[in-house]
C-alpha cells in the first residue's frame, strides 16, 4: 500500500473525516467497510466515512491520479508503480509526526511483525536519493505470476516452462493477464534464457542466475523491448484474449485451458472450479 499526497492546501471538516481508498477488486470484503467505520468511531470517538473504489489495471489507476481526477488517501499499486509515484513526488511519508507519536505512545511498531523478506524487497525499490520506499509504503499482499492450467488438457510438466504459452495445440484456449509488467518481464526472462542456451552459455536445463533475472525485470532497453515484441507477436496468434479480471471465470468454465495469471486469482479460480468439477492447478515456470 502507498499513501497518496492529498490535493489542496487544507481539508474541510467533512474531508478530514473521510478516508478514500483505491484498491484492486476482490481484495477486501466490502462488508468490512461499515464494520471498520463503526469500530473506528468506537476506538477514537471520531466518525469516519470510507469511500472505496477499485481498479483492475495499474496503469489505469495511475492515470486517474496523475490527471487529477482523484485525491485518494491510500492506494494499492504494484511495486513498479510505487517507484514511479515516488519519482513524481506523489506520495507522502506514512509516519507524520502526529501519527508517529500516537503509535509510539501505544508501543506499536509495524516492522516488529513484518516479514524480513518483504522489508528487503521494498528496500530494493528504486527511489529518489535520500528516500526509503519503506517510509512511503507498507506490504499488503504479495504473490507470484505464473500459469493456471486445466489438468484435463495440460500436464504439470508442460506448465513448468513458458514454452506452453507458445504451444499451437492450445490456440484460442490461452488467456493472458492484461498487465504490462507481469507479461513483459516473464517473456523477457524466457527469451533471454533460450538465447543463452542457444549460445551455449547455459545448459539445456539450466536457468539464468537470480541476479540476471532481477536485472532483466528492470530492463527497458530498445533491444529488450524489440525482443519481447517479437515473442508477443507470436503469442498473439494463439491467444483468445487479454483479461484484467474475467480470466478466472474463463478457466472455471473451461473456455480457456491456460491463463498467465497472478497466484491470488489462481487460488480463487481453483476453489471455484473444484465446486463445479473442473480440475485446475497453478505453477510458476522454471525459467
Residues covered by each model-derived region:
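C-terminal motif of bacterial Sec signal peptides marking the signal peptidase cleavage site
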Residues: 5-8
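Early extracytoplasmic/lumenal segment of secretory-pathway proteins
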Residues: 11-88
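Extracytoplasmic ligand-binding site segments that recognize negatively charged/polar headgroups
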Residues: 22, 27-30, 84-250, 255, ...
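General small-molecule cofactor/ligand-binding pocket signal
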Residues: 49-53, 239-241, 281-283
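Paired acidic/hydrophobic, glycine-rich loop segments that form the ligand-binding mouth/hinge
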Residues: 72-77, 240, 257-262
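Short secondary-structure boundary segments
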Residues: 79, 178, 263
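Conserved active-site beta-strand-loop modules that form the wall/rim of enzyme catalytic pockets
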Residues: 247-260, 265-266, 278-281
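Extracytoplasmic/periplasmic substrate-recognition and gating elements
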Residues: 273-287
Amino acid at each position: 500500500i502507498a499513501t497518496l499526497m492529498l490535493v489542496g492546501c487544507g481539508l474541510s471538516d467533512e474531508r478530514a473525516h473521510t478516508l478514500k481508498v483505491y484498491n484492486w477488486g476482490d481484495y477486501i470484503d466490502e462488508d468490512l467497510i461499515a464494520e471498520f467505520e463503526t469500530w473506528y468511531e468506537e476506538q477514537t470517538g471520531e466518525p469516519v466515512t470510507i469511500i472505496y473504489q477499485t481498479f483492475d489495471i495499474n496503469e489505469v489507476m495511475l492515470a486517474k491520479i496523475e490527471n487529477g481526477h482523484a485525491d485518494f488517501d491510500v492506494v494499492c499499486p504494484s511495486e513498479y508503480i510505487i517507484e514511479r509515484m515516488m519519482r513524481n513526488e506523489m506520495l507522502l511519508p506514512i509516519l507524520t509526526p502526529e501519527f508517529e507519536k500516537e503509535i509510539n505512545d501505544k508501543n506499536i511498531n509495524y516492522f516488529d511483525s513484518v516479514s524480513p523478506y518483504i522489508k528487503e524487497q521494498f528496500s530494493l525499490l528504486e527511489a529518489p536519493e535520500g528516500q526509503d520506499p519503506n517510509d512511503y509504503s507498507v506490504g499488503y499482499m504479495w504473490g507470484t505470476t505464473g500459469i493456471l492450467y486445466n489438468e484435463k488438457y495440460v500436464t504439470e510438466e508442460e506448465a513448468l516452462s513458458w514454452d506452453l504459452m507458445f504451444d499451437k495445440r492450445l490456440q484460442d484456449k490461452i488467456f493472458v493477464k492484461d498487465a504490462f509488467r507481469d507479461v513483459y518481464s516473464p517473456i523477457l526472462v524466457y527469451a533471454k534464457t533460450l538465447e543463452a542456451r542457444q549460445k551455449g552459455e547455459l545448459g539445456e536445463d539450466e536457468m539464468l542466475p537470480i541476479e540476471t533475472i532481477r536485472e532483466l525485470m528492470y530492463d527497458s532497453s530498445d533491444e529488450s523491448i524489440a525482443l519481447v515484441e517479437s515473442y508477443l507477436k507470436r503469442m498473439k496468434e494463439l491467444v483468445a484474449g487479454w483479461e484484467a479480471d474475467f480470466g478466472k471465470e474463463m478457466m472455471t468454465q473451461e473456455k480457456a485451458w491456460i491463463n498467465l495469471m497472478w497466484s491470488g486469482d489462481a487460488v480463487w479460480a481453483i476453489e471455484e472450479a473444484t465446486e463445479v468439477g473442473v480440475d485446475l492447478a497453478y505453477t510458476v515456470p522454471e525459467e
